[in-house]
């Protein structure tokens, strides 16, 4: 779609948003034509979500200024300024003419009402339908979004649906009144990669069918490239560049746009020095993990059932090697990692540096020094009550109790320097608390905490999924450097095929607790054999 020369559907000029006197959106301008798909792209804190919320005056305690005119189809219309019309008039626009879908449907949907009731409520409010007609229309809307058994799903509560089904229900609710503009705030971020592709295709189909405009809020450039007509790039509350998607991606003008486009992780794996017959650092044969579950009906009173989370998994990791484990939520990959760490009961054989996990604490302590873990979310894996010195040096208190306080401080500073954090950057670094650091810096703290006991193998459980794309690239680069310098081995758990391609030597693909395919990364990702692997690679938008 070419740049608009005629009147748009929505025309935003000089939009400013401030909280408590601090301005976070700085006088931005953009337009959306009827039936157009505009992507607003940027990292966390860029102001893109606040912009969308401000258009409907949903940003709580915000001071909003500027003009956001919504035009009607009639040529004589002067438009309605969403930022100045009375609240009563705006209430008639929200949900009916402009609808919004949110990032996390589990929190956006009301847990106390069925999905059908929540969709029907919109139709009763805006369309004046009777309760019976609204319920029937809700079932049809769910069917239109591709939910199986829509009548049964309409009677379900949000927690009884999968993540993808909840997002489809949210889309059904948003489209109930056939809005002219849909604000989609990170609509696929909380979903698995294959479900993400399905929701994206669904949105595109519904957009074409209803002829509505879409403002897509996202940090995912692959999503923008595949879905949008035009893109506006936000940084620190400013739109730094906008234009047609093909033009911006092929010839970006602003340095920040170029940085975003270049932020995809690059493959830079260290050569594995060990020979084929070298003893692996981690080896599993017939690994099996199961949980007791309640059986339905009267049988559940007398006997528990069994849920198999990991079944007959075989794998090995050589010194200096990275094994990637990729799969969707519920595939068993994190359970496999917990079993490898000796934190779950398991069946089969599992050896760390040639030894199995023992019952007595002393034997396990030696293995825990060999094997450390870095968790997914640095915001929750670091105690907010502990200083950097306490967090990073904690392992030394257990594994090297003979060290003095000063020696522990020196080791902590050395580990922090290894991950790119120094007192030159952060005065009184050891006395600081986690909240004083960004997400990427917190993940560096978590890596330093793992490295301080000089392990041979790190279990990386989704180490970059909570980070922005540019920070993700930096953290992956750090892990690649540490592997080259220290000869570390990694067990890398992720749902991100791009991260596997950048980091791993070998990969195993898991679904429903079973390993469906395994082998060298180049072979598995470039020439997958199993249909599920093909689906996973295609959904990752790497083609």
What are these regions (language model features)?
Residues 69-92, 130, 201, 301-302, ...:
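ABC ATPase NBD Q-loop/coupling interface
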Residues 133-152, 407-428, 538:
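Conserved ABC ATPase "signature" region
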Residues 156-161, 165, 428, 432-437, ...:
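Conserved ABC ATPase signature
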Residues 176-180, 452-456:
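A short, proline-enriched helix->beta-strand linker immediately N-terminal to the Walker B motif
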Residues 224-226, 500-502:
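A short, surface-exposed alpha-helical micro-motif characterized by mixed small hydrophobic
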Residues 239-243, 251, 518-519, 527:
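ABC ATPase "signature
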């Amino acid at each position: 779609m070419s740049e608009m020369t005629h009147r748009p559907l929505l025309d935003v000029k000089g939009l400013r948003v401030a909280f408590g006197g601090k301005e976070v959106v700085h006088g931005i301008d953009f337009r959306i034509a009827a039936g157009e798909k505009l992507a607003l792209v940027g990292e966390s804190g860029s102001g893109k979500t606040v912009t969308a919320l401000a258009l409907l005056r949903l940003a709580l305690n915000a001071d909003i200024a500027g003009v956001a005119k919504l035009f009607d189809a009639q040529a004589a219309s002067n438009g309605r300024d969403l930022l100045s019309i009375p609240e009563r008039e705006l209430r008639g626009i929200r949900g009916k003419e402009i609808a919004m879908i949110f990032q996390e449907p589990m929190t956006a949907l009301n847990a106390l009402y069925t999905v059908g009731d929540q969709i029907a409520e919109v139709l009763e409010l805006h369309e004046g339908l009777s309760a019976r007609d609204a319920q029937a229309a809700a079932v049809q809307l769910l069917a239109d979004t591709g939910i199986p058994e829509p009548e049964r799903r309409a009677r379900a509560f949000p927690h009884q649906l999968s993540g993808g089904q909840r997002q489809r229900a949210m889309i059904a609710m948003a489209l109930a009144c056939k809005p002219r503009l849909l604000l989609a705030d990170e609509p696929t971020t909380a979903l698995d990669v294959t479900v993400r592709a399905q929701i994206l295709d669904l949105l595109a189909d519904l957009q074409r069918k209803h002829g509505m405009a879409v403002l897509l809020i996202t940090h995912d450039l692959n999503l923008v490239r595949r879905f949008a007509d035009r893109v506006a790039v936000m940084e620190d509350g400013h739109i730094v560049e906008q234009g047609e998607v093909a033009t911006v991606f092929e010839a970006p003008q602003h340095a920040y746009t170029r940085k975003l486009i270049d932020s995809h992780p690059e493959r830079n794996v260290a050569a594995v020095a060990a020979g084929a017959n070298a003893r692996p650092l981690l080896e599993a044969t017939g690994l099996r993990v199961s949980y007791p579950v309640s059986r339905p009906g009267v049988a559940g009173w007398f006997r528990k059932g069994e849920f198999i989370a990991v079944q007959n998994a075989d794998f090995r990791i050589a010194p200096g090697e990275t094994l990637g484990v990729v799969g969707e939520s519920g595939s068993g990959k994190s359970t496999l990692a917990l079993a490898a760490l000796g934190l779950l009961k398991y069946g089969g054989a599992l050896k760390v540096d040639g030894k199995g996990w023992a019952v007595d604490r002393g034997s396990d302590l030696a293995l825990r020094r060999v094997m450390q873990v870095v968790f997914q979310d640095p915001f929750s894996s670091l105690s907010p009550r502990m200083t950097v010195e306490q967090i990073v040096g904690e392992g030394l208190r257990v594994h090297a109790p003979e060290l003095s306080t000063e020696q522990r401080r020196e080791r902590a500073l050395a580990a922090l320097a290894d991950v790119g954090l120094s007192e030159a950057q952060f005065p009184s670094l050891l006395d600081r608390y986690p909240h004083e650091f960004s997400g990427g810096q917190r993940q560096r703290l978590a890596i330093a905490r793992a490295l301080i006991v000089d392990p041979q193998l790190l279990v990386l459980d989704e180490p970059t999924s909570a980070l922005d794309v540019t920070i993700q690239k930096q953290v992956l680069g750090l892990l690649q450097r540490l592997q080259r310098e220290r000869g570390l081995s990694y067990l890398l758990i992720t749902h991100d095929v791009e991260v596997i391609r950048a980091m791993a030597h070998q990969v195993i693909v898991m679904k429903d607790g079973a390993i469906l395919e395994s082998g060298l990364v180049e072979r598995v990702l470039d020439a997958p054999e199993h249909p599920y692997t093909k689906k996973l690679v295609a959904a990752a938008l790497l083609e």
